[in-house]
Regions:
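Membrane-interface capping segments at transmembrane-helix boundaries
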Residues: 422-429
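Membrane-embedded transmembrane alpha-helical bundles that form the catalytic cores
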Residues: 1-415, 429-464
Length: 465
């Protein structure tokens, strides 16, 4: 079920919200939580019901394993059990996400012809696996004692963040499900949440889905792009990805706020970054936080000398790359960001101050080149697009074949301008329910209805991860 689908907007969200607050209105706290959990699992099962078994089994096993970890006194036994828990979660992720990739590459390497059926990737497995990694690791440290099972299940399955984040941390979310003040309907949270949700909806259906037309046309013919088309294609995808994923995150934050649950901000105008380190403070913030806390710091962070620090950066972003998908393109994308951060760190040691505008341009160009690997379906296609972008792949003077519709070029320009406006969570801080904001919400709703009727609804890009 998509946030931008008729089923979600007309039935699922209003029914779930209404029943939840009615139950809490009459002091039925636990039935309210059970209702929200059941609805969240129904939301997940809409895609493929069979994988309910996977997520429910995983929740039960990880909860009780984490609680047991808190109370194992023998350090050696606790460490062994901790490793078993991590490997159990990792093995499930490896099986579903990487088996076909590994078999294909082994066949290529060893000249074998082993054939296995295509394994369907369970929705959101990368996201809820990361959450459980964090929970198990913190349980190993003795930091999750006394967690309630129902609250834990809601932490994992709460539908706004379940499918594609933001990647929430148990320390931030579970106390909110225990807070009595969060159980009652809050007009301020509701109007702010609705406002953020509508802004995210417009980002998705009016901007991201429009730029998808340009990006898909270009990458669908990656080996025959002109110089102009290759740049238009790459920029269109950079805009599409930002508005698609940040739009989803805004809709998730808004939907969470309808239930008085505050989810973390995931984007903070990343294309305004003046260096790559700044970019990762602004782009997919919750993923960056997770990689830092559970990969980079355990490796030693920056505490064990400069050489190991640079190595830790590379390893962290290689993990981040392969987390996104089972393809060499994602590994190369992760390598490019790790390498870029290494270069940035070495540059800082020169004490040479780069003008912000120069840093902004260099960062945008580098990130855009890296996105080519992120989007392309193969390394060969990515290299073909990059060759065209540097004038080596086709007629450098050829006009655009991608912008075939007259409205697409103005849309491209509009999207570039919108990148530099305030984020919906920033706008929400200034939000006060008055006539002006009511008018904004009515206009956003009308625009949303117009686009829902005129443009085919696309899946969110991060559903594939």
């Amino acid at each position: 079920m998509l946030f931008n689908s008729f089923e979600f907007l007309a039935f699922f969200l209003p029914i779930t919200l209404t029943v939840y607050f009615i139950l809490n209105r009459y002091g039925l706290d636990k039935p309210g939580k059970v209702w929200l959990l059941v609805c969240s699992l129904f939301f997940y099962a809409w895609w493929k019901p069979i994988y309910l078994i996977l997520i429910c089994t995983s929740m039960v096993i990880n909860y009780f394993a984490g609680q047991k970890l808190n109370y194992i006194e023998n350090p050696r036994t606790r460490k062994i059990f901790y490793i078993i828990c991590l490997m159990g979660n990792l093995s499930v992720l490896l099986y579903y996400k990487y088996t076909n990739f590994l078999v294909d590459n082994l066949n290529l390497l060893l000249s074998h012809d082993l054939v296995i059926d295509k394994i369907a990737l369970p929705l959101a497995i990368s996201f809820f696996t990361f959450q459980k990694f964090a929970y198990i690791t913190d349980s190993y440290k003795g930091e999750t004692k006394g967690y309630d099972f129902l609250n834990f299940c809601l932490f994992v399955a709460f539908f706004p963040q379940l499918i594609a984040g933001p990647i929430v941390h148990h320390k931030d979310i579970m106390p909110q499900f225990q807070d009595p003040a969060k159980k009652q309907f809050n007009t301020d949270n509701f109007t702010k949440g609705l406002y953020i949700f509508l802004l995210g909806l417009i980002k998705k259906i009016a901007i991201a889905d429009t730029f998808a037309i340009i990006a898909n046309a270009g990458y669908g013919d990656a080996t025959h792009l002109s110089f102009a088309d290759s740049w238009i294609t790459s920029i269109a995808y950079a805009i599409q990805l930002y508005f698609d994923f940040s739009g989803y995150s805004d809709m998730a934050i808004g939907a969470g706020l309808l239930f008085n649950i505050q989810l973390p901000i995931n984007f903070n105008s990343p294309y305004k970054s003046t260096n790559l380190q700044d970019f990762w403070r602004r782009w997919h913030i919750t993923l960056g936080n997770f990689l830092r806390e559970y990969i980079y710091i355990p490796l030693g962070g920056n505490r064990k000398g400069e050489l190991l620090t640079l190595n830790n950066l590379m390893v962290t972003f290689l993990v981040g790359g392969i987390w996104h998908g089972a393809n060499w393109t994602f590994l190369i994308w992760g390598f490019m960001h790790g390498f870029g951060l290494v270069v940035h760190r070495l540059w800082q040691k020169t004490k040479i101050v780069m003008p912000d505008i120069v840093g902004l341009v260099i960062t945008l160009l580098y990130v855009n080149f890296a996105w080519v690997f992120f989007r392309a379906t193969s390394v060969a296609d990515a290299l073909a697009v990059l060759k065209s972008m540097v004038g080596m792949g086709g007629n450098i003077y050829a006009g655009s074949r991608v912008l075939t519709d007259i409205y697409l070029f103005p849309t491209l320009m509009m999207g570039l301008l919108l990148l530099f406006l305030k984020n919906p969570p920033q706008l929400a801080k200034e939000f006060q329910f008055n006539t002006r904001h009511l008018a904004y919400m009515v206009v956003l709703t009308l625009i949303g209805l117009l686009y829902l009727n005129s443009i085919t609804s696309n899946d969110f890009l991060y559903f594939d991860f």
